[in-house]
């Protein structure tokens, strides 16, 4: 509806949003209910695995998680993200930059797409960056 005036348009959804919704629908249909449960289990297990690789002082082990958690680093999270980017990692979201947490807090998300080896490499790189 790019060529239609805003007042006359019948919907406000753009092509990109519709394509994203269609892609999500296809993915969920292909997974099915059991597949979706399996993806959820993988996300949870891999998140807990990554947490187990980080020092206790960085992670609240009692915190309820699903596929993301907050790491409290010994350096500003933005600095850690920048250093990790140089190593080829997309590290997470510095919460302090959003005004949603302390400057040293990094929100890390884990999905079914990452292997245990990738998570081990990420944890090693994060420890190296933070302890430098």
Regions found by a protein language model. Name each.
Residues 1-55, 59-62:
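Active-site C-terminal subdomain of aminotransferase-like
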Residues 17, 25, 105-107, 126:
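Generic signature of intrinsically disordered, low-complexity, basic-rich segments
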Residues 34-51, 57-122:
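Conserved C-terminal alpha-helix-loop-beta "cap" of PLP-dependent enzymes
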Residues 127-132:
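Generic C-terminal helix-cap and adjacent flexible tail
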């Amino acid at each position: 509806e790019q060529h239609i005036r805003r007042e006359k348009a019948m919907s406000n959804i753009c092509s990109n949003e519709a394509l994203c919704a269609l892609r999500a629908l296809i993915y969920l249909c292909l997974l099915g209910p059991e597949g979706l449960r399996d993806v959820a289990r993988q996300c949870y297990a891999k998140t807990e695995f990554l947490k187990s690789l980080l020092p206790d002082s960085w992670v609240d082990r009692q915190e309820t998680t699903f596929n993301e958690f907050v790491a409290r680093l010994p350096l500003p999270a933005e600095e850690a993200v920048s250093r990790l980017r140089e190593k080829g990692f997309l590290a997470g979201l510095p919460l302090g930059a959003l005004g949603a947490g302390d400057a040293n807090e990094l929100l890390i998300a884990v999905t079914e797409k990452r292997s245990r080896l990738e998570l081990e490499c990420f944890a090693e790189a994060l420890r190296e960056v933070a302890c430098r």
